[in-house]
């Protein structure tokens, strides 16, 4: 089945605006909706606290679908695939707490490198039981998330962030090993530039489990004008059966930003509104190229 243009859904991550969500930030959600976005990702962590149910009410009133990611303070000892069984147990308990908060937010999905930790990249031969223990814990977490009505979504990241799942092939293999129907995949065009040789093939490989795509350029800037082969990306996305979610992910830079803390040293997103207009405008043109 081929996707139609009106099945593309566009959104953005809170990180375009700020690092930590608070109850003073609902104007950001209003701005995102006014810019035409219908999907928004909010980040949770031990250093984040706000009225989760208020976020749910606000998003529902705007008609915005929410995804949640554990992108703020995530303890290193909370890791579903760690060699230490204590770390794995703490990881399972920690993600369950985040999922409960995500449920209060009314989130449709909980997305990230939740098979491990995006701050742990081990430079050693993988232990034989590393993937099986990751799969086992993902299965347990997916079942817990299912009971809350939330889809559990894993994101392959580059070798500089983690060693376990870098490609769409590995993501599919881990999802299949876990064997739970509530597991999906979130691809990221920034991480893919390091790990994938063929964007189209990578997307097609994950298509049956694809929940969303984090869309940005190879430098984390707005889509368009960089190294990402967008025609190949959209040719593959048009073949996805069901809605295609495209979500801008970058980090606020400039005087009001926090990009330095995330390893972004160029001024790529000083004006979130301009970033969204440029990025979504480009993506919409790619999604709806018109008659040929």
Where are the regions that the model predicts?
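Conserved radical SAM core fold
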Residues: 72-79, 117-121, 217-220
């Amino acid at each position: 089945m081929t996707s139609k243009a009106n099945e593309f859904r566009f959104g953005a991550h809170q990180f375009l605006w700020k690092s930590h969500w608070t109850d003073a930030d609902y104007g950001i959600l209003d701005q995102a909706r006014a810019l035409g976005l219908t999907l928004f990702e909010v980040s949770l962590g031990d250093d984040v606290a706000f009225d989760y149910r208020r976020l749910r009410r606000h998003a529902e009133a705007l008609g915005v679908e929410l995804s949640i990611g554990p992108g703020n303070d995530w303890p290193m000892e909370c890791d579903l695939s760690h060699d230490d069984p204590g770390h794995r147990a703490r990881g399972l308990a920690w993600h369950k707490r985040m999922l409960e908060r995500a449920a209060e937010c009314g989130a449709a999905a909980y997305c990230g490198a939740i098979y491990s930790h995006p701050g742990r990249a081990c430079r050693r031969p993988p232990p034989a039981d590393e993937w099986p223990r990751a799969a086992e814990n993902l299965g347990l977490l997916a079942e817990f998330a299912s009971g809350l009505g939330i889809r559990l979504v894993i994101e392959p990241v580059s070798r500089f962030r983690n060693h376990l799942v870098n490609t769409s092939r590995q993501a599919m293999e881990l999802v299949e090993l876990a064997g739970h129907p509530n597991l999906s995949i979130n691809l990221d065009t920034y991480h893919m530039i390091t790990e994938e040789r063929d964007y189209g093939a990578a997307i097609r490989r994950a298509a049956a489990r694809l929940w969303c795509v984090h869309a940005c350029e190879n430098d984390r800037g707005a889509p368009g004008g960089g190294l990402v082969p967008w025609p190949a990306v959209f040719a593959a996305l048009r073949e996805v059966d069901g809605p295609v979610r495209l979500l801008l992910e970058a980090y606020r830079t400039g005087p009001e930003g926090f990009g330095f803390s995330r390893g972004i040293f160029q001024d790529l997103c000083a004006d979130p509104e301009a970033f969204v207009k440029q990025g979504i405008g480009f993506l919409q043109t790619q999604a709806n190229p018109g008659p040929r």
